[in-house]
Amino acid sequence: MIDGRSTLITTILSAVLAGTLAMAPVAEACTRLVYLGPEGNIITARSMDWKSDVATNLWILPRGIERSGQAGENSIKWKAKYGSVVATGYDISTTDGVNDAGLMANVLWLVESEYPKFDGQSKPGLTIAAWAQYALDNFATVAEAVEALEREPFMIVTDNVPGENRRTTLHLSLSDATGDSAIIEYIKGKQVIHHDRKYQVMTNSPTFDEQLALNAYWKKIGGTVMLPGTNRAADRFARASFYVDAIPKEEDANRALASVFSVIRNVSVPYGLNTPEEPNISSTRWRTVVDHKRKLYFFESALTPNTFWVDLKTIDFSAETGKVKKLDLGENQDHTYSGDATPSFKDAKLFQFLGL
């Protein structure tokens, strides 16, 4: 039973959240969560919520690809140590993906992001479009990535969202086959890294430290008593946090996968939802789920009836014989694939990251 004090707190909290979101600029929504199961059953899921088609396709990227940070003459340069399967945005950015070592990277919208001013003279630049790819190319584990990123080897360079007059503002989440997790944000021009296995959930606004504080309140109430039900980021964070801990910790990988899919669907926004008074809420266009142990990358579009997967274990990622390949998902990701779609990838010319 909820006492009067809790009811008052709930009312105040709701009012604060409503006021905060009402003043926020238009933003897009996504959710990411990590399931920590027994016997190494680690599963990461994310939803992509966006107001229009992000022209997503899936790509196989082998090791050995030489890349530039696409930030002008003073760009960071590297060669991919690991192969990866990625989901692109507009085929000019990596929005989501997993490498052959089991590291997953996801970028989600965060309107509060403020990146250091890039002058082209000090540290080399890295286009925000390749931020996730840099992690996938260079690191096998979250700990390894965090150790390197703490040294700040580059400066993030952002640009406008394609077709829009606003800057791209993102934060990055990493998870690996051990269940380790990290959230990387840029707040007031400074990099902030939250690194701990317990950081299983990430959504959008507010910043991650504030999300944790709000979630602590809901944990005190208890998810079996009441959970916030709107599509707002803070509510999705609370629901995802409760359910990813509450679902059975299955040794059976397929049952664990079913539970994780049910959670990421629970925090998805109905397709076609248009709420003029809540412009920060957008439809879920697709979902991805990674089984880190079995190295399977699942993809589910809102506009097709099937969930399909890519089996990283069967892919030639070698620098010598591996090939860049693309799975064409079609407009609004409406091409239908079923089961193991790995053989359906076709040889393709490597896409170029959007940069300066």
Where are these regions (language model features)?
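Compact, glycine/acidic-enriched structural inserts
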Residues: I60-K77, E114-F154, G322-Q333
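Bacterial N-terminal signal peptides that target proteins for export
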Residues: M1-L13
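A contiguous strand-loop segment
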Residues: A29-K123, I156, S338-G339
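Bacterial N-terminal signal peptides
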Residues: T10-A22
